[in-house]
UniProtKB/Swiss-Prot annotation:
Tissue-specificity statement: Ubiquitous, with the exception of liver tissue. Levels are high in hemopoietic tissues (thymus, spleen, bone marrow) as well as in kidney and lung. Expressed in the germinal zones of both the neocortex and the cerebellum and in the pontine gray nuclei.
GO MF: guanyl-nucleotide exchange factor activity; microtubule binding; small GTPase binding; zinc ion binding
UniProt keyword annotation of Transcription regulation present: no
Name listed for the protein in its UniProt record: Rho guanine nucleotide exchange factor 2
Oligomeric form and interacting partners: Found in a complex composed at least of ARHGEF2, NOD2 and RIPK2. Interacts with RIPK2; the interaction mediates tyrosine phosphorylation of RIPK2 by Src kinase CSK. Interacts with RIPK1 and RIPK3. Interacts with YWHAZ/14-3-3 zeta; when phosphorylated at Ser-885. Interacts with the kinases PAK4, AURKA and MAPK1. Interacts with RHOA and RAC1. Interacts with NOD1. Interacts (via the N- terminal zinc finger) with CAPN6 (via domain II). Interacts with DYNLT1.
Compositionally biased intervals (Acidic residues): 940-949
Modified residues (N6-acetyllysine): K354
Length: 985
């Protein structure tokens, strides 16, 4: 056993030693790799917190850092891979290469370490295009060969064909060693020696303006004597205007740096992909054009405001018109589109820049050398992107400050106020567009991360796939906790979309639909959101189809409040299922896309027609000016013809009437108001002139007189000026014709747009219209036989379609007939029931009349002191149907007994319950009315009066409320003094 233990112990020791040696080798290898990186000989040193890293320009907070004694560079340990090659090692390699060729090329001057680096012109500017642009393309190997030939001439002078071949080979090798170096070295030298020159060339258009705006404010830019002539309010206003122009100039400079320095260098010098560069600098060309045009307008206004004989002193009194022009109309729409695109991609651009800077050494050194120049100080890529993003937010502040100091001129104040409103509206629209674009990008990101096969069943609708997400807009999204039926919480990603709520889970870095006990897609139709009373972060989602209740919890109380608010807003704006189905099939999606494209094409066609009208008006106006009508104003273009959103745009009848009215006006101008145009089926014949016997504007041979390709309008004595009775200058016939002609042209094109829109609408509504396709095939066929063949080919299909339509109509008519028959039967049954009810009511009426007659006889007998029968006929009176329907008084009504006459008394006694209730009333009534005999003697018509009085006294209460009050009163069994009860009598 001791031997086995010793062998085991020895084996363990050997494994430990081997592991220790392996770790030491790995450490030595890592140290060696760390020491020799890109030619640097790094050593580990201890530094203080104030030492800056050469690679990332950040302080070195770690205790240990790396330093290269060759080039004296101190960096982080993690930044060693991003550092460029060691410059000293490069210089040694270059010097060794030159020394090897020194025996064959004595004219080559060596570079020393202490002297300034000098390179041949071809090495600095390797191509002709780069002489014009600092960062031009090298054009591959052809540029290298060109650089090689030029450098050969520069180094060795002029050699003829008789020069030794070996010498030419040595020259070739030496020039190759100069030109085929690392590309990064070329970039360094190019940028070091040409950034300032190229920047000056770039800003040459605004060189004088930059000098004029070098001062910090207008008060410092103008002369002191000129400054003292103005009030304090004027000085403040001019300072703000000066700041506006100065910052606009700086903004244009920033855009030019982005476009002409950074972007051009990345494309041509670094040979980066255009898509990558476009991702870094989106829409910079459009932004540069917009702000350059605005800056030129501001500078022109400044030049107009200069004092005579001075290039510095100026006072700008009017600026509101320029601001309104810049922030309204097409300019505002262009700014909205470009800034929305740029600001929405701002985050992606910065992320892409950081990724490129971290992984690409050439890109890193390019940026570092570019920003090292004095002219590009504080103008790196990140700073430029941020400055462009923030520029549009500066306009409201500047215009508001100008407005506060412009109380003198009312018109200028109104213009500035309008401009301020336009700028705020533009900024709000840009914010909204940026928010929508960010939501679209986020939705696309979620869509890309979802499993392509992910689906979830929707009860009664079918499977809901990830393609359904792209049909909708993302309104809000966030991570929530879903409480399951078992009481456990699940992390879910909740998407609030146009008409649904979608629950997603993350699995293997992909999103899938939640597979829990409830559907993961909830419709917003009739959705109810309620917060949980005892929980600050929880809320209930109660859906109606299918009826389910979800309990979810947000991260905080504010987050829950935000969710409740946006969900309630979305529920109110949720579209109906007829307009927006929950799940769309492929056919419906295809039709929807086709309809969307059709609408876009219609819009493009309408815009082309509108542009056509504008060009026609411009052409006619130019011809009129060329004909000698110098003072003629440009004609007014017809507005509202091509606006698809207006209700009047689709009124073709109105357009036709307007066009006919314009034609009538032209006829009156050309032929006179008393001449009527005969309307024929083919060609309208013009009436003959009474003097010449020919048509106006028509020669003897029937040809129209033309001038410069247009019909010559007849005018009377055009040379002499025409005036009215008041001496006012009259408009010539050409001027009178010009505006109606423009109106007619615009109306006809508007009518064409209406026809196109209506045809597209009919195609969308009735895709199977055979007659229309037949007409179109006839109209579009160039050959008659081909047209007839097309019609013949469509005939069977037409017949089949017509047969199907007739069958469908027959089926619909049969269904309508059956429905009418059922309706007639129902009406007959209802009429029979009404007749039965009428007969019953007549029988009840006859019975009531007989009872009333019997009561009259009894009352007459009562008046003669005749005793009533024990059972009066009206005691057997059936219950009134209306009384049966009373819910609370049925029992009381059934227990009601009519009064019985008591012998020996001159009054009627009521039952106990009713007497006790109406006792005060009975006493008062007895005193007023007296005995029945007195009433019979005083009454002229005993039947009529007694019946009404007795019925009013003896009838039961008229409403359920009276019965309720009667039931609430306890029954009294005591009778009055000297009055026997009903039972005793």
């Amino acid at each position: 056993m001791s031997r086995i233990e010793s062998l085991t112990r020895a084996r363990i020791d050997r494994s430990k030693e081997q592991a220790t040696k392996t770790r030491e080798k790995e450490k030595m290898k890592e140290a060696k790799d760390a020491r020799y990186t890109n030619g640097h000989l790094f050593t580990t040193i201890s530094v203080s917190g104030m030492t800056m890293c050469y690679a990332c320009n950040k302080s070195i907070t770690a205790k240990e850092a790396l330093i290269c004694p060759t080039c004296n560079v101190t960096i982080h340990n993690r930044c060693k891979d991003t550092l460029a090659n060691c410059t000293k090692v490069k210089q040694k390699q270059q010097k060794a290469a030159l020394l090897r060729n020194n025996t064959a090329l004595q004219s080559v001057s060596l570079r020393s370490k202490t002297t300034t680096r000098e390179r041949p012109t071809s090495a600095i500017y390797p191509s002709d295009s780069f002489r014009q642009s600092l960062l031009g393309s090298r054009r591959g190997l052809s540029s290298l060969s060109l650089a090689k030939s030029v450098s050969t001439t520069n180094i060795a002078g002029h050699f003829n064909d008789e020069s030794p071949l070996g010498l030419r080979q040595i020259l070739s090798q030496s020039t190759d060693s100069l030109n085929m170096r690392n590309r990064t070295l070329s970039v360094e030298s190019l940028i070091d020696e040409g950034v300032e020159v190229f920047y000056n060339e770039l800003m040459s258009d605004f060189e004088m303006d930059e000098k004029d705006f070098e001062a910090d404010s207008w008060s410092l830019a103008v002369d002191s004597s000129f400054l003292q002539q103005h009030k304090k309010e004027v000085m403040k206003k001019q300072d703000v205007i000066y700041e506006l122009i100065q910052t606009e100039l700086h903004h244009v400079r920033t855009l030019k740096i982005m476009t002409r320095l950074f972007r051009t260098g990345m494309l041509e010098e670094l040979q980066m992909e255009p898509e990558v560069v476009q991702g870094l600098f989106p829409c910079v060309d459009e932004l540069s054009d917009i702000h350059t045009r605005f800056l030129n307008q501001l500078l022109e206004r400044r030049r107009q405001a200069l004092c005579p004989g001075s290039t510095r002193n100026f006072v700008i009194h009017r600026l509101g018109d320029l601001l309104i022009s810049q922030f309204s109309g097409s300019n505002a729409e262009q700014m909205r589109k470009t800034y929305s695109e740029f600001c929405s991609r701002h985050t992606k651009a910065l992320k892409l820049y950081k990724e490129l800077y971290a992984r690409d050494k050439r890109f890193q050194q390019f940026i570092r050398k570019m920003t090292r120049s004095a002219v590009l100080k504080r103008h790196g890529v990140q700073e430029c992107i941020l400055l462009v993003t923030q520029r549009i937010t500066k306009y409201p502040v500047l215009i508001n400050r100008i407005l506060q100091n412009s109380h003198g001129v009312e018109e200028e104040y109104q213009d500035l106020a309008s401009a301020l409103g336009l700028v705020k509206e533009l900024l709000s629209n840009v914010d909204q567009d940026v928010h929508e674009l960010e939501k679209e990008a986020r939705l696309q990101e979620i869509y890309n991360r979802m499993d392509p096969r992910a689906q979830t069943p929707v009860p009664g609708k079918g499977p809901f796939g990830r393609d359904e997400l792209l049909r909708r807009k993302l309104i809000h999204e966030g991570c929530l906790l879903w409480k399951t039926a078992t009481g456990r919480f699940k992390d879910v990603l909740l998407l609030l979309m146009t008409d649904v709520l979608v629950f997603l889970q993350e699995k293997d870095q992909k999103y899938i639909f939640t597979s829990l006990d409830k559907p993961s897609v909830v419709s917003l139709q009739n959705l109810i959101v309620r917060d949980i009373a005892n929980q600050a972060k929880g809320m209930f989602l109660i859906s109606s189809g299918p009826p389910e209740m979800y309990e979810v919890h947000a991260a905080s109380r504010d987050d829950r409040t935000t969710w409740i608010r946006v969900i309630q807003q979305s529920v109110r704006l949720c579209p109906s299922r007829e307009d927006f189905p929950l799940i769309e099939t492929e056919d419906k999606a295809y039709l929807r896309r086709i309809k969307t494209k059709l609408q876009q094409k219609n819009q493009a066609l309408v815009e082309l027609l509108q542009k056509n009208v504008e060009l026609f008006a411009e052409m006619v106006h130019f011809q009129a000016l060329k004909a000698g009508f110098v003072g003629m104003p440009p004609p007014a273009l017809p507005r509202g013809l091509f606006r698809l959103e207006s209700f009047e745009s689709l009124r073709g009848e109105r357009l036709l009437k307007d066009a006919l009215r314009e034609v009538e006006g032209l006829k009156d101008l050309l032929l006179g108001p008393c001449v009527d145009l005969p309307m024929t089926s083919r060609e309208p014949a013009l009436p003959l002139d009474s003097d010449s016997g020919s048509c106006p504007g028509v020669t003897a041979n029937g040809e129209a007189r033309t001038f410069n390709g247009s019909i010559e309008l007849c005018r009377a004595d055009s040379d002499s000026s025409q005036k009215d009775r008041n001496g006012n200058q009259l408009r010539s016939p050409q001027e009178e014709v010009l505006q109606p002609l423009i109106n007619l042209y615009g109306l006809l094109h508007g009518l064409q747009a209406v026809v196109v829109q209506q045809e597209r609408l009919m195609e969308a509504l009735f895709p199977e219209g055979p007659e229309r396709w037949e007409k179109l095939s006839r109209a579009n066929s160039r050959d008659g036989e081909a047209g007839r063949a097309a019609v013949a080919s469509v005939t069977p299909e037409k017949q089949a379609t017509e047969l199907a339509l007739l069958q469908r109509q027959h089926t619909l008519l049969q269904e309508e007939l059956r429905r009418c028959q059922r309706l007639g039967e129902e009406r007959a049954t209802e009429a029979g029931s009404l007749e039965a009810r009428l007969r019953e009511s007549e029988q009840a009426r006859a019975l009531l009349e007989r009872e009333a007659e019997e009561i009259r006889r009894q009352l007459a007998a009562l008046g003669q002191n005749e005793p009533l029968p024990a059972e009066a006929p009206w005691a057997r009176r059936p219950l009134d149907p209306r009384r049966r329907s009373l819910p609370a008084g049925d029992a009381l009504y059934l227990s009601f007994n009519p009064p019985q006459p008591s012998r020996g008394h001159d009054r009627l006694d009521l039952p106990v319950t009713v007497r006790s209730l109406h006792r005060p009333f009975d006493d008062r009534e007895a005193q007023e009315l007296g005995s029945p005999e007195d009433r019979l003697q005083d009454s002229s018509d005993p039947d009529t009066g007694s019946e009404e009085e007795v019925s009013s006294r003896l009838s039961p209460p008229h409403s359920p409320r009276d019965f309720t009050r009667m039931q609430d009163i306890p029954e009294e069994t005591e009778s009055r003094d000297g009055e026997p009860t009903a039972s005793e009598s």
